[in-house]
């Protein structure tokens, strides 16, 4: 099992104010590292290479669907690229016994919001979530555990939003 859970955000900014350095860091951490880890996992999992198959779970973001306008468009775009990787790789390696899926957390109470300069973001936006609250890392982890398990043996190229309906 591979869980790609690396992710960074930067300070809130509009696209017109984003530097090339910011974009390079965002895509290197959030997208390119996922590509490289997937590449290595396929080499170690593929039944076509004599291995036992496996499961790859990419931790994307609801931001990939929402866009994060006026805040983190670069983050959303990097996670959108991860979604496309999930689709293409799932199609490419299904016959080799590898399942590839993604989890898209929404407003989850973690330190990533503080690193982006908005430590109260989950509480501030909780009213925009149909369930009326932010989620927990444990709630995301439970979905990842299910996708990694044999209970999800016929699940590939799927996206599970853990976003309270947002």
How does the language model describe each region?
Residues 95, 102, 123-151, 155, ...:
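C-terminal helical subdomain
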Residues 38, 78:
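Active-site helix of classical SDR
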Residues 43, 47, 91-95, 153:
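Alpha-helical segment proximal to the catalytic Tyr-Lys
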Residues 61:
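Residue(s) in the substrate-gating loop at a strand-loop-helix junction
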Residues 71-72, 95, 107-129, 139:
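A glycine/serine/threonine-rich, flexible loop-to-helix segment
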Residues 13-15, 22-24, 125:
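Substrate-binding pocket helix/loop in short-chain dehydrogenase/reductase
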Residues 18, 67-76, 88:
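Active-site loop-to-helix junction immediately N-terminal to the catalytic Tyr of the SDR YXXXK motif
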């Amino acid at each position: 099992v591979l869980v790609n859970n690396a992710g960074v955000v930067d300070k809130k900014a509009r696209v017109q104010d984003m530097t090339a350095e910011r974009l390079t860091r965002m895509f290197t951490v959030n997208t390119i590292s996922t590509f490289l880890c997937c590449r290595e996992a396929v080499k170690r999992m593929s039944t076509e290479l004599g291995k036992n198959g496996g499961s790859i779970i990419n931790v994307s973001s609801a931001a990939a669907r929402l866009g994060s306008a006026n805040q983190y468009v670069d983050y959303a775009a990097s996670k959108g690229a991860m979604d496309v990787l999930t689709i293409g790789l799932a199609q490419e390696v299904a016959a080799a016994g590898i399942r590839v899926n993604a989890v898209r957390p929404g407003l989850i109470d973690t330190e990533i919001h503080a690193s982006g300069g908005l430590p109260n973001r989950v509480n501030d936006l909780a009213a925009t979530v149909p369930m009326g609250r932010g989620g927990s890392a444990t709630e995301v982890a439970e979905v990842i555990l299910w996708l990694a398990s044999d209970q999800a043996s016929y699940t590939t190229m799927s996206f599970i939003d853990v976003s309270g309906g947002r």
